Amino acid sequence: MIKVMNSVEIEKKIRELVGHYLIKDYHVTVKHGDVILWLPDICKDSPFNKLVDEVYGALDDSIRISIIYPNNGKKVSEFIKENIDEIKRMKLI
């Protein structure tokens, strides 16, 4: 039997996985069973590929996961702050 995870459980599980990689600058949004994980540019390279695999493996297949990497080496928090209007318009947060 597959256990259905609620938003809080999903967010907690992702934060736990990201914490293993000592990533401090990230953001998680869980909306209507969809997950948006904002990670720094450095996470595009290995060994962080394993993190992405772990995130996909830890969640139910019915949950859609999107991973966003802010460009130009900006911090995730800076990128979100600078682009908050556009991000809200696109309903990403």
Each model region followed by its residue ranges:
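Short, surface-exposed beta-strand/loop "edge" segments at domain boundaries and coil↔beta transitions
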Residues: 43-49, 74-77
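Short, non-transmembrane amphipathic alpha-helical segments
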Residues: 10-18, 45-64
